[in-house]
Amino acid sequence: RMPNGVLYRDADAAGLAFTCRFTLCVGRARLPAQTLLHTEWFHADCLASYYGVAPLSEEHWRILENFIRAAGEEHGINMLLTPVFTPPLDTAVNGERLTVQLVDVRRDAGVYSFGFEKLGRWAGLCRRHGVEYLEIAHLFTQWGAHATPKIMAVVDGQERRIFGWDVPAASAEYRAFLEAFLPALRTALEGMGY
């Protein structure tokens, strides 16, 4: 709405740019629900590094929630990259990111088992702040899918890296892992309402 219907206009010397002053009245309106899936690569490890906190410590969870809230409530992002394993993205070949892994992996006597509690906490934060969808971290390295992502596990009582750049993506060992992991992940996500 312009007072008295008058537009105040001051053009520059060439007449190419101008400023105008007016009063804008914003009515009460609500946009329809967003239907576009808007995902972003959300690097939880970078937040831990930047703020100097231990990955998945309570302070890190507080920081994550602040950024998830901003993404979902302020920026219309309704899907986030979810680090079930440390995402093998934006690294040099043979490089590693700081470990941020939401799925606990165990291998005892060659048998895999998985814990999804941290993934459930992440999903709860996302849903609470309008992020309805999860983009699961890539299961292969970014540069040609030649290798496996870094995956940490407790193997016979000792935590260690079981996959990474040194393990080919097409290896029988990784295939056996995926055959155990993917059905368990699907069941866990369905249990969380996905």
Located regions from the model:
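Aromatic-lined carbohydrate-binding surfaces of glycoside hydrolases
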Residues: 1-194
